Each structure stands twice: as C-alpha cells, then as structure tokens.
Amino acid sequence: IHWIKGRPRIKVNYHPAPDYARGKAFFNVTSRYIETYSSSNNKDRQYLYSSLPLQGIVNHQEFILEKDEFFLLSYNEKVIPVDIEREKLEYCRTLVYWLNWTDRTRKFTIYNDIIERSLLTLKMMSFYNGAVLASLTTSLPEAVGEVRNWDYRFCWLRDASMSIETLFKIGHADAARKFMKFIQSTFVAEHDTYQIMYGIRGERKLTEVILDHLSGYKNSKPVRIGNDAYHQRQNDSFGYLMDLIYQYYRLMPGTLDEIEDMWEMVKSIMMTVVEDWRKPDKGIWEIRGEGQHFVSSKVMCWVALDRGARIARILNKYENSRRWEEEADAIKADVMRNGWKEEIQSFSQAYGNLDLDSSLLLMEPYGFIDADDIRYHKTVKAVKKSLLHKGLMYRYNTHDDFGCPSSAFTICTFWLIRALYVIGEKNEARCLFDEILQYSNHLGLFSEDIDFETKEQLGNFPQAYSHLALVNTAVLFAEEDKRLIFK
C-alpha cells in the first residue's frame, strides 16, 4: 500500500475460505504471519504476512496509514524474514520480469495495446511446467440462474494448443518449448494414452464434485470442482495439438534427442487418430449426451493427419507420410460426402442433423477448405444468418443436454469476424470487431460468454479462448494496416 500524504483510514477484510469452505476456517496468529487452515483439511495452509498488526487484521480493526505498508499472501511459509524493503524489491523484480516479457512481443501499428493485454493474460494462465489453463475460475455461469457451470481450471489439449500457438506466433517460443515438455511428461508409462485434458501438474483423474453448500454466482447452482469431461472422447483435440507440433517442428527442431522424442509422440497421436476418427465423439463443445459424428471433429482429425504427414516428409519418413496422407484424403472425402447438406446449402454441425455450428468456420483457417471455395462462402453466410444475434454469436442455437444456449460464446464472434474477412467482407468484419471490443471490462479482459441483451460478461473469467481469438483477429487487421502503410 503506497502512502502519499495525510492520515487515511483503512480496514482489511481478510476472510479466506480454505478447502472451498467445506469446513470451519481456523486462524493462528504468530509474531510473523497469520496461518489459516480448514477443519476439513488441515494439510493445506495459507500464510498472510503484513507490516500492519496481525491480530488487528483478524479482528477487522481500522488502521491509520502514515507510511507504506505491505501484504503478502503465500501458500508456503517463508524461510527468510519478510519486511517492507524486501517486498519492494520483489515488486520491482516482478515489474522488470513483465516489462522484459512484453519487450519480446511483436509490436503492431494498430490494436497493439489490446493484443499485448491479451498475450499477458494468456501468459498469466500458464504454469511454470508449460501447462496452460482454459480459465482461472470455476462455476461462473454461462447464463445467470442456469446450470451450465463448469470448472475450467485445467489444461485442455485443444485450448492450450491454441493458446500456445498464439504466443508462439507473436514471438514467445519458450512457451511452446515448455508446453511440449509438459505433454511429453504426461506419459509416465508406456501404456499411457492421451486424455483430452489434464490437471495443471499433469493429473489424470479430475473427478467432478458438486459443492451443495455453496450458492454460486448470483445463486446460479451448482458449483463444481473437477470436470468429468476428462473421460470424454473429443477427436478434434489432436488436430489443434498436431498443428502446433508441426509449427514447432518446422521452426524449432531442437536437438536430435528432442526430434526423436517428438517423432515418437507424433506416431502415437497418428495411431490414435487413425483408430478413432470414424467413431462418434463429444465434439468441441463437450456434449454430455450421446456422441455424434461432428463435422468439426472430422475436420480436425484431417488436420492432425495432414500435419503428421508434413512432419514425416521433413524427416524423410515417406512411408508414414504416404499412409497418413491417404487416411487424410479418406476423411476429407467422408466430410464432403456426409457433412455438406444441399438442403441448407452449408456444412452441418454433424452428419446426422441439419443444424449449424460456429465451429464450422474453422474449416478454412486450418486448411481443410480454401477461402474461395463456394461451399465455404455459403457455410459462412448460413452460419452468420442462423447464429449471429445483436452483434454476437451463438456457438449453436439448438437443444442440447441442458436446453438451448441463451448467451453468446465470445470466441465464436471472433471466428465469424475472421471468416467474413477472408471471404472478402472486410468492412463488416472490422465493424463487428470494433463492436465486440467495447464489451471487455475496464482492463480489457473477456470471459467465456456475453449476455446478448445487457452485454454483461458471463462464464469463467478470464477465458483463454476469448483472448487467443482476440489476438489472432487483431493481428489480421494489424497486418493489413501494415501492408497499406508500406505499400
């Protein structure tokens, strides 16, 4: 707390609820810190250090500020004594770290501030071991009063791969290097298989538990910890991961040992994709009902095989390349035959329905279909007509396990903006982009969802999906601006 002048009064509200308030919180005030733990789990402890009287903090006393003071909240007891001078040094060290990090980021003539803010957000959602969280919160509702409340504090292959690829393209290769090591570390035994998601330390078991004693945000129950989606088959996940691995292989091959380790991982992923792409799955939206043959899942399986074949060619593994190219061709033929629906003049969400889905917009950026293909043009226009509402996009607007979605899914609006841009509707794309930027909070942060009417941010916050898509879309316009300036 930086004191400027006068004698201002402050009161500290310190109410930690360890172990999700499943037990009573106990406070142990020592001469150095306030130690907090729960009656339901006394192994996990929190330590609050401060230059203010510690007992006064616990008693909610009012303090008169006459000089700089500090608070330090830690999950570990500090070995070295903590004082105001040390904390000022730690603050300066932190400031220098983030200044250096942003200095390594590409700069742009327009939208640079929002690009930088989003990249910082993605970085802060990264763990030191390379894992990247989908969000930092659990159970903030997609719509107030409904039950679409999920725990996003995990590392999905899909979300993390997209986040890391965004950081990689903007100049942060170290993030990609660490993530690759994290993925490799999840195989602790030869018989291990890939999951779609992991805990931040590589945990495989992510059992979902409902905390009935908590009322939730604005009384939106249930509050969940854990996520049972880790059991699901989501065939699209490997496409995002393989796209990242290909970019990494192409630009940062590494040592011979690293190349060989990566090649073993690629072969394992290819084997899984070949075995699974014909099977129904839960898709990018993690449907909790019966699996379907989602078009976006088939497309991303094609991406996985296509990128695997490219890597094989780089390594002169032509037999592998040939096999995977043939399998990729089979997927493309299958999608063109079963995914395109003449009745709606568009690709559909799944082989067995005529529904539209925002994930269909990803067919072009991942190279499955050309931007000038008439089928993609028609799909973009059909998706826009069906799912764009008041400047924002539904991911889909048909019934699922919980009814019809009632809020906008932020990343989908960015997908539409890119799709409109590449099919030539650049002015409309720019207008939509400038409009959605107005719906961030005062720090430029986005959650998962936005209310169509009030523009209130909903869902878990901040959301990696939203920020990686914002960066990619902003870069699209910034690169065009650069071309116009230096033409």
Where would I find each of the regions flagged by the language model?
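Acidic, mature catalytic/reactive cores of soluble proteins
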Residues: H2-K487
